[in-house]
UniProtKB/Swiss-Prot annotation:
Residues 52-61 have a biased composition (Polar residues). The chain crosses the membrane at residues 1-21. Residues 62-73 have a biased composition (Basic and acidic residues). It comes from Polynucleobacter asymbioticus (strain DSM 18221 / CIP 109841 / QLW-P1DMWA-1) (Polynucleobacter necessarius subsp. asymbioticus). The Tat system comprises two distinct complexes: a TatABC complex, containing multiple copies of TatA, TatB and TatC subunits, and a separate TatA complex, containing only TatA subunits. Substrates initially bind to the TatABC complex, which probably triggers association of the separate TatA complex to form the active translocon. Its main location: membrane. One of its GO terms (molecular function) is protein transmembrane transporter activity. This is Sec-independent protein translocase protein TatA. InterPro entries: TatA/B/E (IPR003369), TatA/E (IPR006312). Residues 44-73 are annotated as: Disordered. Part of the twin-arginine translocation (Tat) system that transports large folded proteins containing a characteristic twin-arginine motif in their signal peptide across membranes. TatA could form the protein-conducting channel of the Tat system.
Length: 73
């Protein structure tokens, strides 16, 4: 009862193919592959220290002084 044999997995695969169809399964596989590739590319760029986002050194030229007033008079 612990492990399924190859025949169990083949029957499950046939049932899934009948329910979803091969075109739908292919689209799901492509979407999943694209997501994994995007994740790997993101992790690769995060590990590369040469490609860090430069820090902005500009300061605000204008400051706004706001005086709070009591609305409830």
């Amino acid at each position: 009862m612990g492990s399924f044999s190859i025949w169990h997995w083949l029957i499950v695969l046939v049932i899934v193919m009948l329910v979803f169809g091969t075109k739908k399964l292919r689209n799901i596989g492509q979407d999943l592959g694209g997501a994994v590739k995007g994740f790997k590319d993101g992790m690769k760029s995060a590990e590369d220290p040469n490609e860090q986002i430069p820090q902005s050194t500009t300061t605000a030229e204008k400051t706004v002084d706001v005086q709070a007033k009591d609305i409830n008079k």
